């Protein structure tokens, strides 16, 4: 069953393209890119997810990430 999102593919793709553009402008190698994106994810989780839900959200995110690179 496909995952349904409340966001359009176009909206997601535009934001991803902008993130990739910034990394490209800085000639960021893979390790630096992953560090920056990881730090951004950590910031989003700490600032926008209630403490009691962070562990579950983090685990779900990690599972989704692992599935997306298989």
UniProtKB/Swiss-Prot annotation:
**SUPFAM superfamilies the UniProt entry points to:** YejL-like
Extract the InterPro entries matched here. UPF0352, YejL_sf
**One Pfam family of this chain:** DUF1414
NCBIfam families (UniProt xref): PRK13689.1
Q: Do you know which HAMAP family this protein is assigned to?
A: UPF0352
UniProt lists the family membership as follows: Belongs to the UPF0352 family.
Q: Quote the protein name from its UniProt record.
A: UPF0352 protein PSHAa1818
Organism (species) = Pseudoalteromonas translucida (strain TAC 125)
């Amino acid at each position: 069953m496909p995952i349904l999102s409340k966001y359009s593919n176009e909206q997601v793709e535009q934001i991803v393209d902008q993130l990739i553009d910034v990394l490209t402008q800085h000639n960021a190698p893979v390790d630096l890119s992953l560090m920056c994106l990881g730090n951004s994810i950590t910031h989003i989780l700490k600032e926008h997810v209630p403490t009691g839900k962070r562990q579950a959200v983090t685990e779900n995110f990690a599972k989704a990430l692992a599935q997306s690179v298989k």
